[in-house]
UniProtKB/Swiss-Prot annotation:
Disruption phenotype: Hypersensitivity to abscisic acid (ABA). Mainly expressed in vascular tissues,predominantly in phloem companion cells, with highest levels in roots and seeds, and lower levels in seedlings, stems, leaves and flowers. Mostly observed in inflorescence meristems relative to cauline leaves and developing siliques. In seeds, mainly expressed in the endosperm and, to a lesser extent, in the embryo. It comes from Arabidopsis thaliana (Mouse-ear cress). ADP and vanadate (ABC transporters inhibitor) inhibit the ATP-dependent abscisic acid (ABA) uptake. High affinity abscisic acid (ABA) transporter that mediates the export of ABA, with a preference for (+)-ABA, through the plasma membrane, especially in vascular tissues (e.g. phloem companion cells), and is involved in the intercellular ABA signaling pathway. Together with ABCG31, export ABA from the endosperm to deliver it to the embryo via ABCG30 and ABCG40-mediated import to suppress radicle extension and subsequent embryonic growth. It is found in: Cell membrane. Induction: By abscisic acid (ABA). In cauline leaves, activated by cold stress, but repressed by heat stress. Within inflorescence meristems, down-regulated by both cold and heat stress treatments. In developing siliques, activated by cold stress, but unaffected by heat stress. It catalyses: abscisate(in) + ATP + H2O = abscisate(out) + ADP + phosphate + H(+). Residues 9-20 have a biased composition (Polar residues). The gene is ABCG25. This is ABC transporter G family member 25. Residues 388-594 form the ABC transmembrane type-2 domain.
Length: 662
């Protein structure tokens, strides 16, 4: 029995020849067939990872108790774990392959390997596309759908796919053609009824799980991939939704000549019948690869058959788990079943599979077509220009973030704070220096903590989507980052400007349009600097919980050294106030209200040297105002430092994002 019955006929048959469209710029011709056929081969694929651990389990307990450790306690043992071991298979254009196996069998690792997403010395073996190595050009024709649906929840289905089309389709296509391509994919995958519904997620009500999975597939179909790899696309779907989704995938393979590979955990019998080729994994080793219709006959030939009629997929998964019910009651234990099947595969099936792969060759005519189509004529595969990427990403960001930036609770938070400040300091007297200094410092605290804390979640929350889109080459890092910078300028400044507008005139701070505009400018610059701190910490740590803790401690240090709470900062901590955004904002707000300092000293009854004969306490207060409130940092120096922080923190955030591998 041949593992790949009829492979040679399919490779040389009429279905494998490329189908050229009359006008490659039309969306229907762009999506109706593969630009070139892809034959995927993988031979003896192995993947190993090294696990580092302590040789003595008591080492961690000793560290917690503060006990001394022996040199032997610090010796680390390195264990190498094999995820994949000698996996071999092949799939031709127009075929639908399913990778079966229990959890932890290596299905996702194999799919990442064949999709070109695993690199390094840990991966060995051959992975060939059209008898050649994986290249950047072939990766551009490979679509990868992850198990999790990584989509923006506030965008509608249409908006999601339109933005993808504008970013991923070649720049040679006009905008109208790209929009029609998005509409074509929406219609093809049956998303028309929900195209104007938000995608949603666990917390936001939106489309169903099956529809969300089809949106993820449409995300990749827009580039018209010749090879489509899907990691457990039916996970979380009911039987009917899973069947409809698999029917769609089978239609892409059989009707459009695409090469489709998917992993699936536990398919129904109806779903199993749609697979052309099945590959069964168990603990990283292959137990079967071949036509799905031949699987039961093969296992019967090696001594394993079900005692009663059952779903073939369930029987295969039982075998992969090392369990076989021979009479409906007893079970053979796992080691015997698994080892027997591995030995049978290595002896009977593996040689036939490798021979079939060796004798099948990709037609030279098709190879020349691929080279011409990708490198020469036809539609160029260049992505959008940098400026176009910036505009599209900025538009998408504004649509997605408007719900977060102008959330009702967030607006209530700012309005409530503004009203409380206005009532607490209602028409305060210009000579009530201590009261007004308290208000100015409260403003510095509130608009330092709030923007930094909100910004710290930006990049950690988008990490998964950002990594996937960068891996698919949708845009450059610089355009993505610049879109976030510009988006924050337009959205994050509305609330602080509204807060100050109400509070300033309710409190009746220094009258005049010029002092108000100066105060507003300082506050907005301070908000952007504080936001930059949050972006930098979030990008550097990339863990929302840890980053929020770090930014809270950092802002606490900035507040304590801001020049209001402590009369005399310890000499060892003086440096902290000079890196504090709160320190410079507070200095500027005081300077705008009371000038260079002579006026505020005069109001307190201090002479030019900061002395007063009334009492020692009052004299100490004068010295505090003179040394800490007025200080030795000028207005222009403070403005310059805030601008430096505004740019510096964002540069650090950009450099931190460059570390992320995709």
């Amino acid at each position: 029995m041949s593992a790949f019955d009829g492979v040679e006929n399919q490779m040389n048959g009429p279905d494998s020849s490329p189908r050229l469209s009359q006008d490659p710029r039309e969306p229907r011709s762009l999506l109706s067939s593969s630009c070139f056929p892809i034959t995927l081969k993988f031979v003896d694929v192995c993947y190993r990872v090294k696990i580092h651990g302590m040789s003595n389990d008591s080492c961690n307990i000793k560290k917690l108790l503060g006990l001394k450790q022996k040199p032997s306690d610090e010796t680390r043992s390195t264990e190498e774990r094999t995820i994949l071991s000698g996996v071999t298979g092949m799939i031709s254009p127009g075929e639908f392959m399913a990778v079966l196996g229990p959890s932890g069998s290596g299905k996702s690792t194999l799919l990442n390997a064949v999709a070109g997403r695993l690199h390094g010395s840990n991966l060995t073996g051959k992975i060939l596309i059209n008898d050649g190595k994986i290249t950047k050009q072939t990766l551009k024709r490979t679509g990868f759908v992850a198990q999790d649906d990584l989509l923006y929840p506030h965008l509608t289905v249409r908006e999601t796919l339109v933005f993808v089309a504008l970013l991923r389709l070649p720049r040679s296509l006009t905008r109208d053609v790209k929009l029609r391509a998005a509409e074509s994919v929406i219609s093809e995958l049956g998303l028309t009824k929900c195209e104007n519904t938000v995608v949603g997620n666990t917390f936001i009500r939106g489309i169903s799980g099956g529809e969300r999975k089809r949106v993820s597939i449409a995300h990749e179909l827009l580039i018209n991939p010749s090879l489509l790899v899907l990691d457990e696309p039916t996970s979380g779907l009911d039987a009917t939704a899973a069947l409809r989704l698999v029917q769609t995938l089978a239609g892409l393979a059989h009707g459009k000549g695409k090469t489709v590979v998917t992993s699936i955990h536990q398919p129904s019998s109806r779903v199993f019948q749609m697979f052309d080729t099945v590959l069964l994994l168990s603990e990283g080793k292959c137990l079967f690869v071949g036509k799905g219709r031949d699987a039961m006959a093969y296992f019967e030939s090696v001594g394993f058959s079900p005692a009663f009629p059952m779903n073939p997929a369930d029987f295969l998964l039982d075998l992969a788990n090392g369990v076989c019910q021979t009479d409906g009651v007893t079970e053979r234990e796992k080691p015997n079943v698994r080892q027997t099947l591995v030995t049978a595969y290595d002896t009977l099936l593996a040689p036939q599979v490798k021979t079939c792969i060796e004798v099948s060759h990709f037609p030279q005519d098709n190879a020349r077509f691929v080279k011409t189509r990708v490198n020469g004529g036809g539609i160029t595969t260049c992505i959008a220009t940098w400026f176009s990427q910036l505009c599209i990403l900025l538009h998408r960001l504004l649509k997605e973030r408007r719900h977060e930036s102008f959330d009702l609770l967030r607006i209530f938070q700012v309005v409530a704070a503004s009203i409380l400040c206005g009532l607490m300091w209602w028409h305060s007297d210009y000579r009530d220096v201590h009261d007004r200094l308290g208000l100015l410092f409260f403003i510095s605290i509130f608009w330092g903590v709030l923007p930094s804390f909100n910004a710290v979640f930006t990049f950690p929350q988008e990490r998964a989507i950002f990594t996937r889109e960068r891996a698919s080459g949708m845009y450059t890092l610089s355009s993505y980052f610049m879109a976030h910078v510009l988006g924050s300028l337009s959205m994050e400044l509305v609330l602080p400007a509204s807060f100050l507008t109400f509070t300033y005139w309710m409190v009746y701070l220094r009258p005049g349009i010029v002092p108000f505009l100066l105060t507003l400018s300082v506050l907005l610059l301070y908000v952007l600097a504080s936001q930059g701190l949050g972006l930098a910490l979030g990008a550097a740590i990339m863990d929302a919980k840890k980053a929020s803790t770090i930014v809270t401690v950092t802002m606490l240090a900035f507040v304590l050294t801001g020049g209001y709470y402590v009369n005399k900062v310890p000499s060892g901590m003086v440096w902290m106030k000079y890196v504090s955004t709160t320190f410079y904002c507070y200095r500027l707000l005081v300077a705008i209200q009371y000038g260079s300092g002579e006026e505020i000293l005069r109001m307190l009854g201090c002479d030019s040297k900061g002395k007063q004969g009334a009492s020692a306490a009052t004299s100490a207060g004068c010295r505090f105002v003179e040394e800490e409130v007025i200080g030795d940092v000028g207005m222009w120096t403070s403005v310059g430092v805030l601008f430096l922080m505004f740019f510096g923190y964002r540069v650090l955030a950009y450099l931190a994002l460059r570390r992320i591998k995709h």
